[in-house]
């Protein structure tokens, strides 16, 4: 992305100039009138650029209710993949994150032989005539012909910037100063590809991003591998991505500004790293502090201890709840590791908040139980389990979560069957509908995935 528009407050109002060239209906591709995405009112047939160094008179090549595609005069007019793909990506985005203004369309602009890279604009910005825009270019005069690889990666990336800059009807991206340009997009794009059923693109993207290394907030950071993918894969996937923006919209400070046409809410400032971890923990429904420490270390880019910021964020935003109560309880298991609870793979490792240790027991017993007993009652609304570092057939497969206040009468709170873990040391979140307080919680494991042994790296209980 070449330019960011999230922080711009235009001092002038610009409108597209009158067009001297008319396009006949036969020159514009439109959706089938019987399609649910068909429209009766067309967007402008031409659009004069008036932003940054852009000065092209754009030609409308396709439109429906989801997308309006514009080419400059140097783009091959036979290219059609944006018509379907961008409409699908935009529809999926709106279905996931909500609407973006009153116009249902994404306005997609393509350049060939100029303006390498891309930028977004949102419906808040007069700079691009109050439209949700992605504007992409290439130095290659024959660009955009494949509709694969970088063609969809770059355009999807720019849509992701609209999400972070205009979700929930609020302008700006409070997290941009933390994840910079592209870290959020890496997980957004992965989710879009999966959501559209483009599994080969999702796999391609995953393989591209897993080895990616960044120098912020510290050198050697793997944003996708160690943060976004574990959060996504272990804690609710698409719903968690959306919930992050929902929580921002509910609780993060904002004020009202105007663009000269209408007034709208805008986030007041950027979040600090502790707030970032706090809001993502709220979105995940689990305490992500340890995951963040493993991924980023304890210092933000300026050298500040973000764990102090996190403690303050919990005070500043108390409505965001994800209290991990595991450490308040006493663990017991019905069969212990041969070396004892304190052994390298003893039961103490099950609740040590270290996702790289594990509990192992040889000779998996039928009806194995692990229990947490608390001095007072709590409402556990969710829990996590983390797979071991090897041999997936040792993972739990069928289990129940139960609660009790006396240790004799137990109530079933959650039942899971046929469960598998996609990767080693994968953390998965399981939500319950429990609203009752219990002083004892246990997981009863009736089957693993086939091994004579059993292992689990971590079990955490989350109070709502």
Residue ranges and their predicted role:
Residues 2-50:
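Bacterial Sec-dependent N-terminal signal peptides
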Residues 27-44, 311-334, 462-464:
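Low-complexity, Pro/Thr/Ser/Gly/Ala-rich linker/spacer regions in secreted
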Residues 38-126, 152:
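Zn2+-dependent metallopeptidase catalytic core
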Residues 128-211:
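Zinc-dependent metallopeptidase catalytic helix centered on the HExxH motif
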Residues 175-176, 217-220, 390-393, 450:
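Short consensus segments that form the blades of beta-propeller domains
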Residues 191-219, 232-253:
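Short helix/loop segments within enzyme catalytic domains
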Residues 257-329:
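Beta/coil-rich, acidic/histidine-enriched accessory regions frequently appended to metallopeptidases
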Residues 340-414, 424-464:
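Aromatic, loop-rich ligand-recognition surfaces of beta-strand-rich domains
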């Amino acid at each position: 992305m070449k330019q960011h528009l999230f922080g711009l407050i235009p001092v002038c109002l610009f409108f597209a100039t009158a067009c001297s060239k008319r396009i006949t209906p036969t020159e514009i591709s439109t959706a089938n009138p019987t399609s649910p995405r068909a429209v009766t009112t067309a967007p402008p047939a031409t659009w004069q650029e008036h932003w940054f160094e852009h000065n092209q008179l754009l030609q409308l090549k396709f439109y429906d209710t989801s997308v309006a595609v514009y080419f400059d005069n140097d783009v091959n007019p036979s290219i059609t993949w944006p018509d379907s793909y961008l409409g699908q990506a935009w529809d999926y985005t709106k279905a996931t994150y909500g609407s973006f203004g009153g116009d249902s369309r994404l306005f997609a602009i393509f350049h060939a032989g100029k303006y390498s890279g891309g930028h977004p604009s949102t419906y808040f910005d007069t700079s691009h005539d109050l439209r949700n825009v992605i504007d992409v270019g290439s130095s290659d005069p024959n660009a955009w012909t494949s509709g694969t690889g970088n063609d969809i990666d770059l355009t999807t990336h720019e849509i992701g910037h609209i999400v972070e800059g205009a979700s929930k009807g609020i302008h700006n991206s409070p997290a941009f100063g933390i994840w910079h340009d592209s870290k959020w997009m890496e997980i957004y794009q992965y989710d879009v590809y999966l959501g559209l059923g483009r599994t080969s693109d999702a796999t391609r993207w995953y393989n591209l991003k897993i080895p990616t290394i960044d120098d912020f907030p510290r050198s050697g950071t793997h944003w996708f591998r160690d943060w976004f993918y574990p959060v996504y894969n272990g804690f609710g996937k698409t719903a968690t991505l959306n919930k992050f923006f929902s929580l921002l919209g509910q609780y993060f400070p904002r004020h009202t500004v105007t663009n000269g046409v209408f007034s709208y809410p805008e986030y007041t400032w950027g979040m600090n790293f502790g707030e970032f971890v706090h809001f993502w923990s709220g979105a995940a429904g689990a305490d992500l502090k340890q995951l963040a420490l493993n991924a980023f270390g304890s210092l933000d880019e300026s050298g500040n201890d973000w764990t102090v910021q996190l403690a303050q964020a919990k005070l500043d935003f108390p409505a965001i709840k994800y209290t991990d109560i595991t450490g308040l309880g006493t663990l017991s298991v019905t069969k212990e590791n041969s070396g004892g609870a304190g052994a390298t793979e003893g039961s103490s490792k099950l609740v040590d908040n270290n996702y790289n240790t594990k509990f192992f027991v040889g000779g998996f017993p039928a009806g194995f139980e692990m229990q947490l007993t608390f001095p007072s009652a709590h409402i556990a609304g969710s829990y996590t389990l983390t797979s071991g570092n090897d041999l997936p057939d040792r993972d739990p497969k069928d289990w129940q979560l139960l609660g009790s206040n006396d240790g004799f009468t137990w109530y079933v709170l959650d039942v899971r069957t046929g469960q598998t873990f996609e990767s080693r040391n994968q953390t998965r979140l399981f939500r319950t509908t429990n609203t009752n307080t219990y002083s004892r919680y246990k997981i009863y494991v009736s089957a693993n995935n086939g091994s004579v042994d059993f292992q689990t790296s971590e079990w955490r209980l989350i109070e709502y």
